[in-house]
């Protein structure tokens, strides 16, 4: 049933091969997504530009992970194991109450999030993201590649990662250029083979960068411009 849900929701044939069969079409050599990226050693600030990402559990030992970040760092990471719709929705509601004005993005791939989405939509705006949907960037294969590209740019710009588990997931994540010239992120199942667990936290973090409008605050943007031209 779970496989059928993904098959029906992922329309891109290449993405379907990646998600269901762990296969990437003819490609060049793999590259770590953090290659040539310098990770910041310290957090450079804080603000109230809060964004939430929710990666939904799909199979077996996968967990639902909720990440909240501001423009500078991760402020919450909540893993939920074998959690039902009510439990997940309740955690989201608590975070909304805590952080007030917050933008929310949820993994809608395969329809696993439908119950949570319906509950949260009663009182709050929530954006469902199908990882296999069309990319906004013409050089990326799909929305998942868009999100990770934006995440890497943020890290290179000083976004602080102080969670070792997320660092491990990031370093285990690579990309390739497909035979049609698109950037594709390695499928979760292949990353899971390296780590021994699914990179759910990193996918939740990447979701917070789905929209470039939620990347950094205006204050942080001005700081980065100052660094570039000093």
Protein language model features and the residues they cover:
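Conserved hydrophobic/aromatic positions in well-ordered beta-strands
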Residues: 67-69, 205
């Amino acid at each position: 049933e779970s496989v059928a849900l993904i098959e029906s929701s992922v329309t891109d044939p290449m993405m379907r091969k990646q998600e269901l069969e762990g296969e990437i079409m003819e490609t060049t050599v793999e590259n770590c997504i953090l290659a040539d990226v310098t990770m910041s050693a310290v957090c450079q600030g804080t603000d109230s530009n809060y964004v939430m990402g929710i990666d939904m559990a799909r199979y077996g030992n996968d967990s639902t992970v909720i990440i909240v970040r501001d423009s500078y760092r991760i402020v919450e990471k909540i893993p939920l194991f074998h959690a039902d719709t009510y439990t997940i929705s309740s955690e989201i509601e608590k975070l909304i109450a805590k952080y007030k004005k917050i933008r929310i993005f949820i993994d809608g791939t395969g329809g696993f999030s439908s119950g949570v989405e319906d509950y949260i939509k009663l009182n709050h705006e929530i954006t469902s993201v199908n990882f296999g949907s069309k990319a906004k960037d013409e050089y990326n294969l799909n929305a998942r590649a868009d999100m990770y590209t934006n995440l890497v740019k943020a890290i290179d710009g000083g976004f602080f990662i102080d969670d070792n588990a997320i660092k491990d997931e990031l370093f285990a994540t690579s990309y390739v250029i497909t035979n049609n010239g698109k950037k594709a992120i390695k499928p979760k199942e292949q990353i899971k083979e390296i780590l021994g667990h699914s990179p759910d936290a990193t996918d939740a973090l990447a979701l917070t960068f789905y929209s470039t409008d939620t990347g950094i605050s205006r204050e942080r943007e001005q700081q980065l411009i100052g660094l570039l031209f000093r």
